């Protein structure tokens, strides 16, 4: 025991010495706000910061007040938000000094409401990269226009490249002055304001050298201070900041993000690690993850099964480790209205949060409210408490225990029961230096946590958090409304058409969101040309699909890959005038890696030669091999250890979800061979080439995604290499093929994350544009232009009444449970109306729509875009914001559904 105490004293001495060697923290207004190794001190008072993440851009402004009220009721003293650049500057400015396209009215209103109406401090996180499962991670789509041709980092955005930093400065110069006036330092004493501003976001996950990251952080800090930001600046999960001796970076402090799931005890150890690495700043959790996001084709937030025990336990274990600042991410998640979520994100951003998407509360809300009550009672004491060493009886193997003591001697004993099934009910004996041994009877449910407050002053002890009560539910709920019929109309393409200049993207002409747009070309063809051309070849700015009709007939895609924008139009063309119309579906702006820096829309398109066939190559064998492949022939001739994989369309769709959501292993384990690992795998297949295929040049092979890099071999000879994981790998094998069976192999090298062949492979004749076409573009669908979204049914005879199912259950969630129909148009509009009862003002009841339909598109409630409906699911239930409903009156719900090639667009039922 004496050796242990000596070791502790030595460690504490080394810890303090290390802290003293770091540059002293400087504060613009230390009398208003400052911090030390323990906590924040605001206007002379030590504060335990309990913060709720609440994104103002994910809920209608009319509902902010309700969400703030519930945040306040739960005991929070602070609220946190990201500030998305692309939300506030939606149109490309004329130049880097032009700020005329920025609109910050909602940000200013939100800050004012938080500070003045609800007395909450705020934390602002302006990026420019925010992640947040938000379109582009916050970057405007138009920024990609300025992407340099060459750069030496993993990708351009987030890097130290001068062009990126120039536009980052543009953003900071625009946004910082807006919220500078809302800083605590600009307010009167006693008023609330912004207490912290974040630079960048989770920089640890961006692949760039530390020196370059430090350069970025120094510049960002200067952009802030030059624009009047006086409150402390921070980062999250950015190791370069922790313990830095750099003159600028040492004035920042880093926070932890905790994704501990049910390993709740890690919340304590992570905070202890943070305090060791950063001994001169408070230990703050920027994202205390109490839930998770939903993904298209994956699972919903509710499927993560993180309940009130989890929300309570994370907070208490972080406090046990010494945290004096916690930000629940998300406390309120909200909705990705109008498709503003990142690629493959559902409309719901409920996040499994304590405050539900609809504003409802649950047992998780009660659990967090209990934490809030505890912090409000003891936060000031906890802020400067110290961890103390102790020993216990040996019956606590299933418990994680932490003890902290205040200057006054009050003890906080934190306990977490790690056992998943068995409650802990027993006496635990504590031995603390300078105190007589004492027993504590602990009764803790499985995976639950508590804290015992033991007062030295009066010897009283009491368990926290206290159980909280939830509001009473209404006794008489309104009956569900099952819609019996709808009106249906196919898209007429009567948009506002304008000439499209060659090579111009949609962001350059004002489309920076994820709406549907249209392209049209009218071309005169001779009889000879009709016989010559048989494909429409489209080049895109990013991996989004087009849907095409030629002379009123739907053109089929050249392969099973939905992102293959080559169409077989042989038989659809005729001599004379031909009209080609296409709908562009923006699948969403990726929030990570190189797809972030891609423009959107169609780059060019024209007619190509006829294709005899485009063959998908779906059946492969794979095995993991040594990194340095020298003798490819020996490897291929050895038939041991190979596993068969089918790279068909369903496999590819499933893998796309797995890459984003990190879900369970798939049924096809071979595709998982390089998941999350550094390594090499070899894939092999056989292709039987006929003389006709060789004569017609059907020798091009395309791998839609080789992650991270690959080398192609044909019949044992090296053909080509490729190292751009986000670009297709296309090679011509004509010089290596012969009639009959050919052995094709690709060696794939992966450094991190998902690796291998992640998309489809096809064999075809060379596809190129032989006859370029002139195009027009319409920025919106014809139905949007004609007012369908608001319920207008212009077009008269185009609208038909259809009957919906009114029996049976409509499932509120599920993947691939949509009704099956046949594609008979590119896009179809549906309109339903329903009457809602009046409700008493003191009675609040949220409404939702359960929809079962095939097709993918957007939904409008009384003219407001409430988000995106994805055919594949899993989301089938959608929040209807009460501020957009006509209570006691008639409401209109409109769906614009792009028909799927396999199921059409069938609206089966709405409730």
Predicted regions and their residues:
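An active-site-proximal structural segment forming one wall of the substrate-binding cleft
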Residues: 103-124, 149-194
């Amino acid at each position: 025991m004496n050796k242990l105490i000596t070791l502790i004293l030595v460690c504490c001495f080394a810890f303090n010495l290390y802290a003293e060697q770091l540059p002293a923290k400087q504060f613009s207004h230390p009398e208003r706000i400052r911090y030390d190794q323990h906590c924040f001190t605001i206007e002379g008072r030590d504060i335990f910061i309990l913060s709720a993440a609440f994104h103002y851009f994910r809920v209608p402004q009319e509902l902010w007040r309700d969400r703030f009220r519930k945040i306040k009721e739960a005991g929070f003293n602070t609220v946190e938000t990201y500030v998305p650049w692309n939300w506030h500057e939606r149109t490309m400015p004329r130049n880097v000094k032009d700020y005329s396209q920025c609109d910050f009215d909602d940000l200013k209103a939100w800050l004012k409401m938080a500070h003045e109406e609800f007395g909450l401090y705020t934390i602002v996180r302006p990026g420019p990269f925010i992640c947040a499962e938000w379109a582009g991670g916050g970057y405007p789509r138009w920024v990609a226009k300025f992407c340099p041709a060459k750069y030496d980092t993993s990708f351009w955005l987030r890097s130290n490249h001068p062009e990126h930093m120039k536009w980052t400065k543009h953003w900071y110069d625009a946004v910082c002055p807006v919220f500078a006036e809302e800083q605590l330092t600009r307010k009167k004493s006693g008023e609330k304001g912004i207490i912290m501003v974040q630079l960048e976001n989770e920089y640890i996950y961006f692949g760039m050298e530390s020196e370059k990251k430090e350069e970025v952080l120094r510049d960002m800090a200067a952009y802030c201070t030059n624009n009047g930001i006086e409150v402390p600046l921070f980062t999250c999960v950015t190791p370069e900041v922790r313990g830095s001796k750099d003159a600028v970076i040492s004035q920042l402090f880093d926070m932890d993000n905790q994704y501990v799931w049910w390993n709740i005890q890690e919340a304590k150890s992570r905070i202890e690690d943070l305090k060791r690495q950063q001994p001169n700043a408070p230990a703050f959790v920027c994202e205390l993850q109490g839930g998770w996001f939903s993904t298209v084709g994956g699972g919903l937030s509710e499927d993560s099964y993180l309940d009130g025990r989890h929300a309570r336990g994370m907070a208490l274990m972080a406090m046990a480790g010494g945290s004096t600042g916690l930000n629940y991410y998300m406390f309120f998640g909200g909705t990705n209205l109008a498709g503003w979520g990142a690629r493959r994100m559902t409309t719901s951003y409920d996040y499994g949060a304590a405050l539900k998407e609809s504003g409802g509360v649950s047992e998780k809300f009660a659990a967090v409210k209990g934490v809030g009550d505890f912090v409000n009672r003891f936060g000031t004491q906890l802020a400067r408490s110290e961890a103390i060493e102790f020993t216990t009886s040996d019956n606590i193997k299933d418990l994680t225990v932490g003890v902290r003591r205040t200057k006054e001697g009050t003890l906080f004993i934190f306990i977490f029961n790690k056992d998943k099934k068995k409650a802990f009910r027993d006496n635990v004996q504590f031995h603390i230096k300078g105190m007589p041994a004492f027993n504590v009877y602990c009764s803790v449910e499985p995976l639950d946590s508590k804290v015992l407050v033991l007062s030295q002053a009066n010897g009283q002890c009491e368990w926290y958090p206290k159980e909280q009560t939830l509001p009473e539910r209404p006794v008489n709920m309104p009956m569900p409304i099952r819609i019996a019929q709808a009106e249906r109309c196919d898209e007429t393409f009567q948009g506002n058409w304008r000439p499209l200049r060659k090579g111009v993207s949609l962001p350059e002409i004002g489309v920076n969101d994820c709406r549907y747009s249209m392209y049209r070309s009218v071309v005169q063809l001779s009889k000879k040309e009709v016989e010559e051309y048989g494909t429409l070849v489209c080049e895109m700015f990013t991996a989004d699909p087009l849907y095409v009709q030629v002379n009123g007939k739907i053109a089929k895609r050249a392969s099973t890959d939905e992102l293959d924008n080559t169409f077989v139009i042989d038989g659809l063309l005729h001599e004379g005038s031909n009209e080609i119309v296409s709908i562009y579906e923006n699948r969403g702006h990726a929030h990570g890696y190189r797809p972030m820096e891609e423009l959107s829309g169609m780059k060019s398109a024209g007619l190509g030669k006829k294709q005899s066939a485009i063959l998908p190559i779906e059946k492969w064998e794979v095995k993991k091999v040594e990194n340095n492949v020298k003798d490819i022939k020996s490897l291929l001739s050895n038939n041991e250890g190979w596993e068969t994989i089918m790279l068909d369309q369903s496999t590819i769709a499933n893998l796309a979800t797995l890459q984003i959501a990190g879900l369970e292993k798939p049924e096809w384990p071979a595709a998982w061979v390089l998941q999350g690992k550094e390594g090499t795998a070899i894939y092999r297949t056989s292709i039987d080439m006929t003389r006709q295929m060789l004569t017609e040049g059907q020798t091009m092979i395309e791998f839609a995604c080789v992650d991270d890099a690959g080398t192609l071999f044909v019949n044992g000879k090296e053909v080509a290499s490729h190292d751009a994981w986000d670009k297709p790998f296309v090679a011509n094998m004509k010089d290596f093929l012969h009639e009959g069976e050919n052995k094709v192999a690709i060696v794939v090298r992966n450094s991190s994350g998902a690796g291998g062949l992640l998309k489809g492979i096809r064999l075809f004749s060379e596809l190129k544009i032989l006859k370029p076409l002139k195009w027009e573009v319409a920025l919106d669908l014809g139905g949007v232009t004609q007012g369908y979204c608001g319920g207008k049914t212009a077009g008269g005879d185009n609208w038909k009444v259809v009957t919906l199912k009114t029996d049976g259950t409509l499932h509120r969630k599920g993947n691939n449970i949509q009704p099956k129909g046949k594609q008979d148009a590119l896009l179809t509009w549906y309109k339903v109306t329903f009457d809602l009862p009046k409700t008493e003002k003191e009675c609040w009841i949220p409404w939702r729509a359960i929809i079962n339909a095939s097709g993918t598109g957007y939904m409008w409630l009384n003219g407001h875009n409430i988000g995106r409906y994805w055919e594949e699911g899993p989301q089938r239930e959608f929040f209807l914001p009460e501020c957009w409903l006509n209570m006691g009156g008639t409401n209109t719900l409109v769906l614009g559904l792009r028909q799927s090639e396999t199921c059409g667009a069938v609206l089966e039922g709405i409730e």
